[in-house]
Amino acid sequence: MEKRKDVRQLIIDAAEKFNNKTAFVYNDVEYSFAKLQNDVFKLANGLLNLGLRKGDKVAIYLPNCIEYAYSYYAIYSTGLVVIPIDFFLTDKEIISIGNHCELKAIITTENVKFDLKELKDAIPTLEHIITIEKNTNYHYFWDLINNSSNELADQGIDISMPSSIFYTSGVTGKPKGALWNYEHIHLGAEQMKEMGSYEKLLNIVKIDVTERSVAPIPFSHSAGLFYFTIAIKYGMSTVIMPRFAPLELVKLIKKWGATNIFMAPAMFYAVLTLKEIENYSLDTLIWATVFGAPSSPDLMMKFAKLCPNAVVLNGYGLTEVVPPLTVSSPQNIKGFSYIVSNINLKLVDSHDKEVKKGEIGEVIVKGKSVFCGYYNEPQLNEQVFKNGWFYTGDLGYFDNDNTLYLIGKSKDIIKVGGELVWAAEIEEVLLRYPGIREAAAVGVPDPLRGEVVKCYVAPADSTQLNKNDLLDYLRKNLAKFKQPKDIIILDDLPKTGPGKINKTALKELG
């Protein structure tokens, strides 16, 4: 296979090229590329000194922090396999993941709602618990750094080796482990850089040492890896947010002069609904991208007004195919007009035949950005891979200009009698109603029609929503078979860690 520089060598190169320039900012402390190399290589040796070896699985269960960045780099520099675990998950879910992947070590914090010792008792393969706080019962993260050498030998890592297992959020079912190899961890940064060569984004998306981002998305998400690989490849710096808070995000953008941001739709909406937002102009931003879930163009246009010097973009990606796959143009953020060169993408019908322009089909992809499959799930892999193509479950169509429009997931089709209802269509209509912040449509069992539509909405701050008014509104805007049997108004809709609405949790609410 082709020879490319491993993470260890990229860190060495970045320290030489960018040296004392800032790689990360955390709690107002700036961490240079030179310090990054010193500390990461010490941590890498600390992990090796524990007896961990290539192929061993090491979980990171932390909120966003500098220790998270160091852990990623150290694991990748030694040929270990990183298991980033969403910090919202419970101990039972961690135990399930740990047993599924045969976890060997975990880097975590004592600030959790369970006894860490329970993990060791419940996961037979777990040998090492490393905490970022000093505790005599566990390995201390900073002791591994302070007591180790900063000279790290080449570990002989092949790009075909497993590098990461991302346990997907389980929005529509049980979480699954998406396996990446050591080449995949480079591709996201390279595809982001490639986006900047798209003629409609020239001199806008630069991805270089002149750029700075604020990171509100969880580092456990596959998109969180962007910040780490972009830094050591291209010199872009990142301000780390421990957790998303809309006002704090705005303040950090202003304070540190961030040039770009990428977030989930719910995060953009949270910023827009801040009472204090009228006091801010995010004039340092050059580009802002929404990703991770369907978004309303109206929402993004409202955000654009806060950023007088920025273009607003829509990105499409998924954990199973190194994101981003596609990006919109600034002129049409509803459609995706640029597809990265690492993949082939087409739309097929239920008989695996490519559909014509304007016809709806399932998005299938092939290429080196496609993941290696679901870890230890051979039957599932047989279902989602056919003739080298990965079937994403996402549905869309191409217009005559070859712009891709996504309309939802195949799992989000609600079969009402003999009719097919697209949940995304109903959600889009609901989001146009004044005062609705979030909306979700799901199918629920019905003895006569098989399924019927049920909707859940969350109001904007200080807005009072009336169920009967909402039902009347939908009767005027939707065909009868698409109209929901019921609408439930909640303060907030349940989310997964990356900010997607959790429809499985909604269905469990009844």
For each feature predicted by the language model, list its residue ranges.
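Conserved AMP-binding/adenylate-forming core of the ANL superfamily
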Residues: E2-R4, I12, N20-G51, D56-C65, ...
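Conserved pre-ATP/AMP-binding loop-to-beta segment of ANL
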Residues: N20, T136, S149-Y167, G173-K174, ...
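Conserved AMP-binding A3 loop
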Residues: S32-A34, S163-Q191
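Structural core segment of the AMP-binding/adenylate-forming
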Residues: N49-L50, S77-D143, D461-T463
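AMP-binding/adenylate-forming catalytic core of the ANL superfamily
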Residues: L89, I95-S96, I106-T108, I261, ...
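Conserved AMP-binding/adenylation subdomain of ANL enzymes
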Residues: H186-R212, S220-N260, L274
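Gly/Ser/Thr-rich phosphate-binding loop
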Residues: K233, A258-F262, L274-I333
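Conserved ATP/PPi-binding loop(s) of AMP-dependent carboxylate-activating enzymes
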Residues: I339-N342, K353-V384, E419-V421
